[in-house]
Amino acid sequence: MANKEMFEDTVEERVINEEYKIWKKNTPFLYDLVMTHALEWPSLTVQWLPDVTRPEGKDYALHWLVLGTHTSDEQNHLVVARVQVPNDDAQFDASHYDSEKGEFGGFGSVSGKIETEIKINHEGEVNRARYMPQNPCIIATKTPSADVLVFDYTKHPSKPDPSGECSPDLRLRGHQKEGYGLSWNSNLSGHLLSASDDHTVCLWDISAGPKEGKVVDAKAVFTGHSAVVEDVAWHLLHESLFGSVADDQKLMIWDTRSNTTSKPSHSVDAHTAEVNCLSFNPYSEFILATGSADKTVALWDLRNLKLKLHSFESHKDEIFQVHWSPHNETILASSGTDRRLNVWDLSKIGEEQSAEDAEDGPPELLFIHGGHTAKISDFSWNPNEPWVICSVSEDNIMQIWQMAENIYNDEEPDIPASELEAQGS
């Protein structure tokens, strides 16, 4: 039995490597930007910070990322990294392809383009880190313990204390177990939600400050789910509404003005397996998406949750992340265990397709990012550069990429099909 499993693993590894080679060869036709960077340790979390600096006379802009570490047994850190993202006119073109190396000059390799600016000691791996929209210097993190930690990175040295002591600015209490879901309210400063394996969602208001020491107790604990709560998200336009999803296969919508914390305003059987993630559309107040272990992303309308609007189907394994584009109302992306990040366009649902195109996926599947060779842990849309995404995977790899403009602008590519190597062949 063990031999059979080893053989299957070797075959899978070979397939993954082969697919990666094909992907790499096709990058100049599929992307306007690809930066691949190996982190010292894998990060389970990634989020672009909202700041951008455009140095005069340079062909790049400076952006910042919030990352974490997931080490074997060494000290873990919360990390802020600075990234040089090339301007449109500096990005690579097909003429830089080095056929011997099988990769691009220009922006394929990124030595010196990504640098760690701040490293803060952290208790255990960083399950997730998210900045507060009203003050991006404040970052909340999920840890392997039940506590949620809050750091103001301006109050910490850029190099961590070698003793390894973790000293968060606040410690948020209320959970019994660890978890992943974390969401700041974009309309109410300091209001933070967290989802946990203890089946609950906790709400804190950190603007009130700690009662004693650095500890803040939960303002409310929501107990509607009957299993691990995987994710939680505030509505982006209504300050009192939020959603939660869990291993009980349910999507629940809550209103903090309600006088009960044990029963949601709405509860829907969203999927046929665990629901791992959710995201509210930033432009449309009624639309949200959920991602599931059933390999689908579901589209919902808050006005009629009994009816699933659409199911996006192409992933071959569990979906753990789903995020709407900050720039385009109809664009969302999803990723997970199958090593793929899919970008979807709602406006293409139901479009006619040739049989050949249908083999690649439904018409609403705009793009498949195939650059990762391990499970994708998290991804983030850049708020300042449309269509730029940063994704991180379990094998330490971080990629910053932007699909080719002709893909989202619906222009016909000017490459003969004979030049493109099929990803499946």
Curated annotation (Swiss-Prot):
Xref: PANTHER family: WD40 REPEAT FAMILY
Location (main, coarse): nucleus
Pfam families: CAF1C_H4-bd, WD40
InterPro entries linked: G-protein_beta_WD-40_rep, Histone-bd_RBBP4-like_N, WD40/YVTN_repeat-like_dom_sf, WD40_repeat_CS, WD40_repeat_dom_sf, WD40_rpt, WD_repeat_RBAP46/RBAP48/MSI1
Keyword NAD belongs to the record: no
WD repeat spans: 47-122, 128-173, 181-217, 228-269, 275-312, 318-369, 376-403
GO terms for biological process, alphabetical: chromatin remodeling; DNA replication; regulation of DNA-templated transcription
UniProt xrefs under SMART domains: WD40
Compartments where located: Nucleus
Subunit-structure text: Binds directly to helix 1 of the histone fold of histone H4, a region that is not accessible when H4 is in chromatin.
GO MF assignments: histone binding
GO cellular component terms given for this protein: ESC/E(Z) complex; nucleus; NuRD complex
Protein name from the UniProt record: Histone-binding protein RBBP7
Record organism: Xenopus laevis
The keyword Glycosyltransferase belongs to this UniProt entry's keyword annotation: no
Function: Core histone-binding subunit that may target chromatin remodeling factors, histone acetyltransferases and histone deacetylases to their histone substrates in a manner that is regulated by nucleosomal DNA. Component of several complexes which regulate chromatin metabolism.
Keywords: Chaperone, Chromatin regulator, DNA replication, Nucleus, Repeat, Repressor, Transcription, Transcription regulation, WD repeat
